[in-house]
């Protein structure tokens, strides 16, 4: 639940340079984390911006998603929340209803809400929050636009050079190899503390 930064400006010195490199390379998406900063953390700034934000999970945190990631770092892609953040691990916003939480996530800068124990989120909750005026129109427009753009840029629609049957055959042929490679890379990336 808690994210600890005991060293002053540790985020600027150690954690955020990797994210800045990803942003500079125009990465399509970044996943926010479920944890929240401890209230007793050392002072944290990035490029002069105070990021000693609210003690809520990043998916609910406008200071981190909007002010830091988008406005200061220049991120233009979509923000995908961590899984289960809406119902089971809503750190810092436990007192809010799921309806209030989903509205807060969109208004804070989240664009895609992660799954719930492997099941897709029922977006009727977002529609209800929007119809009740809980989600700002610009937040929903931003999230929808970023979702559609990411799908279109992934070359999945209306490509006159792509035949559906050829694409499905290629996917069937390469999916097992890609899955094996992804598992191998994930295994090699683990760090034992």
Walk through the language-model features, giving the residues of each.
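Glycoside hydrolase catalytic-domain context in secreted enzymes
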Residues: 1-193
């Amino acid at each position: 639940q808690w994210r600890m930064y005991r060293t002053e400006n540790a985020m600027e010195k150690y954690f955020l340079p990797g994210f800045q490199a990803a942003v500079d390379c125009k990465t399509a998406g970044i996943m926010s984390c479920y944890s929240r900063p401890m209230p007793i953390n050392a002072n944290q700034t990035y490029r002069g911006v105070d990021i000693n934000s609210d003690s809520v999970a990043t998916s609910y945190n406008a200071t981190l998603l909007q002010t830091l990631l988008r406005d200061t770092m220049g991120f233009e892609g979509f923000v995908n929340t961590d899984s289960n953040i809406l119902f089971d691990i809503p750190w810092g916003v436990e007192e809010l209803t799921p309806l209030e939480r989903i509205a807060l996530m969109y208004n804070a800068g989240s664009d895609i809400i992660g799954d719930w124990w492997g099941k897709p989120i029922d977006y009727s909750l977002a529609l209800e929050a929007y119809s009740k005026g809980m989600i700002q129109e610009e937040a929903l427009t931003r999230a929808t636009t970023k979702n559609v753009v990411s799908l279109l840029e992934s070359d999945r629609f209306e490509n006159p050079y792509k035949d559906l049957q050829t694409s499905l055959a290629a996917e069937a042929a390469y999916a097992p190899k890609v899955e094996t490679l992804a598992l191998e890379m994930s295994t090699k990336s683990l760090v034992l503390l």
